[in-house]
Curated annotation (Swiss-Prot):
Record region (Disordered): 1-70
GO cellular component: cytosol; nucleus; photoreceptor inner segment; photoreceptor outer segment
Gene source species: Bos taurus
Localization terms from the record: Cytoplasm, Cytosol; Nucleus; Cell projection, Cilium, Photoreceptor outer segment; Photoreceptor inner segment
Protein name: Phosducin
Record PTM Phosphoserine, positions in chain: S73
Biased composition (Basic and acidic residues): 28-50, 58-69
Function of the molecule: Inhibits the transcriptional activation activity of the cone-rod homeobox CRX. May participate in the regulation of visual phototransduction or in the integration of photoreceptor metabolism.
PTM comment, free text: Light-induced changes in cyclic nucleotide levels modulate the phosphorylation of this protein by cAMP kinase.
GO biological process entries: regulation of G protein-coupled receptor signaling pathway; visual perception
Chain positions covered by the region annotation Thioredoxin fold: 111-245
Length: 245
């Protein structure tokens, strides 16, 4: 049973540790567990305790039986305490794996604000030369057009919340294709990744409420799967689930 439990624990974490192969995951778990334990406080093995508990005792030796019962109570307590220590150690290991995973996923370019593009050439350069893993959201606007200022303000907030996404804005008159972006199609949102256009939303404010806020724009983009998950959301959710257990 101990072997089956160990195998189950090892399989649960396959692919989450810093090593990718099954042997690497098993070694990660064993190393983490050994580092977390105090060798002086290791309890008796479960197999030995079960063997002792199932051993026949003389009914005539009442004192010996009572002493044995008291001994088993202590050992049972130590066994339960050991199980709790293993569970806590397992939770710490899971949390460390999640932190390592998020650190790796978060590695890459970070932005955090809205870039003002000054020309069509700069616009094309941004789309073509940015890293392929980066999502680029471009707001094409013009001063005095309803909804453009509000959308710019919302994108400033989203840029801070999603630093791995590159948010840009450019005036329609600066794109070199002003005839394609007349006032009746503004504000327009273009979303790119890897040099490819993912989505094109013209007159985007018509799909929002008359008065919209950052959360409305975020929900709109999430409906189309255009925003990545916020950086520590999964880790925080995992921690909450562990605290509830």
């Amino acid at each position: 049973m101990e072997k089956a439990k160990s195998q189950s624990l090892e399989e649960d974490f396959e692919g989450q540790a810093s090593h990718t192969g099954p042997k690497g995951v098993i070694n990660d778990w064993r190393k983490f567990k050994l580092e977390s334990e105090d060798s002086d406080s290791v309890a008796h093995s479960k197999k030995e305790i079960l063997r002792q508990m199932s051993s026949p005792q003389s009914r005539d030796d009442k004192d010996s039986k009572e002493r044995f019962s008291r001994k088993m109570s202590v050992q049972e307590y130590e066994l339960i305490h050991k199980d709790k220590e293993d569970e806590n150690c397992l939770r710490k290991y899971r949390r460390q794996c999640m932190q390592d995973m998020h650190q790796k996923l978060s590695f890459g370019p970070r932005y955090g604000f809205v870039y003002e593009l000054e020309s069509g050439e700069q616009f094309l350069e941004t789309i073509e030369k940015e890293q392929k893993i980066t999502t680029i959201v471009v707001h094409i606007y013009e001063d005095g057009i309803k909804g453009c200022d509000a959308l710019n303000s919302s994108l400033i907030c989203l840029a801070a919340e999603y630093p791995m996404v590159k948010f840009c804005k450019i005036k329609a008159s600066n794109t070199g294709a002003g005839d394609r972006f007349s006032s009746d199609v503004l504000p327009t949102l273009l979303v790119y990744k890897g040099g490819e256009l993912l989505s094109n939303f013209i007159s985007v404010t018509e799909q929002l409420a008359e008065e919209f806020f950052t959360g409305d724009v975020e929900s709109f983009l999430n409906e189309y799967g255009l925003l990545p998950e916020k950086e520590m959301h999964v880790l925080e959710q995992t921690n909450m689930e562990e605290d509830m257990e």
